[in-house]
């Protein structure tokens, strides 16, 4: 995808001489030149305006009106598009979602302050001259020269206050509540990679070092970062590549679906990265974080922090300490497995509905939803950690009243993780603090509810820091229940909280009462009963008289404005009172804002304690949801050990059973991996019989067990798996030019090269994407290799019934089938998995059910009979394996 500036080169700001632009647009271009690859939102009064190429992009992407503005005599009219200041977050969210970086340029003084600044500058310069010398241009802070001949032409000072990129947003409207918003950074050295990622809205900050590009790509696909930082040689300090946009700076091995931001290589130098990280976290060494000897990870982390310092423009980002991890700590799920198992979204339409997350998510808070999502994508290997989660689910399973009580409380808890982050960064608004206060006041009820609990995750909430309870009380006492979004216009602080504020409010009430009395007095004095006292921002307070009564206006009334139906007047007395009221209101608003700021800073000092409690509440919420699912859908607690067994009694698919009417799902057993049990099951049966559902079911039960959840079965004993592999279905990869069969073979090769005896492998229809004989040969060889060389636990679903012969020539292989019942005119799918191999696939019956013409069905039966009569594949395989076995014995 081309850079927007070159895409819309007619209006590229670099094409215009600055001297040809109006002073305001000179200021705009000055800022734009510092951020050429970002969309610049430039505050003008009540709007954020965009100009030139940016305006065309914003108009197109946001579907707002494209207007124009005079840019100067030589240039004429240029494109302009604006958004109201109160809708900034909503529109920024849309732009960021589309992969743009956005620069916010705000007014840092009022027009009145700008005029006063110009007046004082003019006086100062004249005092240094003889009074007759011409005025000299004044050099502004941003380098622009303006001739101050009149205060009316003064430019208001503006400054960049935020640089918003997809991975650096904090505002609620710019985030998805139940998903983390990760910013990642990468550093490469040979085959190795350093990876750092952070969610600045929650403070999470993790690093790792990976031995291959393949491992890196799998981690990126798990994390789904909103933005990935790369070191590059681009001349601009921030170049953002939108999804799919080509660049020689992005290594070919990296997925093109993410936003990549190119940053200068100096940000990723080891010494500078180490210094910056130690300074950020106030430590003398990185050893305590476990990454001192991981130079690539340290470099990536340093580049990430430097990026935050530049984009946040003075906003403090309170990241938690660095956590170092390795892939070997978790059950590894590659992207294809996560996709095939539909963990967080369906393959068909990418929706959450119909996914495992949909079936399990009963969380009451968004932070609990994020925790559950992370757990599903990164199951555990440590049986002790798994057991701690299981113990908590078990207690909440057994104690139904406790679970329901906790969930009722949790329904009133807001996103403590992100609220804490906004308090720590100083960006929280008054409604954030109200939500924080309400949430903190729920914590004592949670602590009381779990006071007698014995499981670890519940016990963690038995003690709430006293300072957080006090903070919650203070927030409730100080702030009104529904404060305004704008912090500088008053209405934030409750009555009776601050003596000085109460005195100022009392004076305002007296002055406004005076206005009411003035209206009554003037009506009586003039005899004009329709006379009113009004106010607007342009003219302040005025006396309004209808046009028909205007001749009765006293001579001391000074006409200020004439409208269609009324005349508006002022008096010296009214203007004097107006000045008093407006000054008092401004002082009152400022005092309220000062009180709010002190309160926000106090909350920010507790960010670490807030986040610690938030993580505990999120975990409790996720576990309570898992317990609720277990109760309502009759799940059991699995037994996990260090063996290799997969013993599932009456297992069910957790998603399908919720998507169909209750009682319709047919449970099935699975036994493999232990002594005297097969390592590999050849699963045959008709189309539509449920083979694919069964193999996914086994994988999901294994995964849920290692998450620490209960599982949909009557009983389950499972050995911990180090990896789960699935190869289920395939489509052409048009982006890389790979056919369906090539994709299938690539995925199969990945499994054969990485599976271990502790892995769980689920294969469906290997070899079906090519000629029958080739496909059968590959399927046989793959199954044989898994059974005899890797000896991992495998279920191999196939329509190649000849593979049933493998059990007679390779040890550790067993045949199972999904049964049907044949009636006179149709077949009934029983969906029951039983020992033995099927000898028919009933594909023609499925075609008949799908509506194939009767003549086609009849012809297919004839052809099938001829093929079966002359096929000697099974005999040949049996003979060749028998000969091979005899040769090996000899």
From Swiss-Prot:
Binding residue positions for ATP: 685-692
Matching InterPro entries: DNA_mismatch_repair_MutS (IPR005748), DNA_mismatch_repair_MutS-lik_N (IPR007695), DNA_mismatch_repair_MutS/MSH (IPR017261), DNA_mismatch_repair_MutS_C (IPR000432), DNA_mismatch_repair_MutS_clamp (IPR007861), DNA_mismatch_repair_MutS_core (IPR007696), DNA_mismatch_repair_MutS_N (IPR016151), DNA_mismatch_repair_MutS_sf (IPR036187)
Recorded superkingdom: Bacteria
A biological-process GO annotation: mismatch repair
Assigned keywords, A-Z: ATP-binding, DNA damage, DNA repair, DNA-binding, Nucleotide-binding
GO MF term list: ATP binding; ATP-dependent DNA damage sensor activity; damaged DNA binding; mismatched DNA binding
One Gene Ontology cellular component: cytosol
PROSITE patterns: DNA_MISMATCH_REPAIR_2
Job of this protein: This protein is involved in the repair of mismatches in DNA. It is possible that it carries out the mismatch recognition step. This protein has a weak ATPase activity.
Family membership noted in the UniProt record: Belongs to the DNA mismatch repair MutS family.
Protein name: DNA mismatch repair protein MutS
Species the sequence originates in: Gloeobacter violaceus (strain ATCC 29082 / PCC 7421)
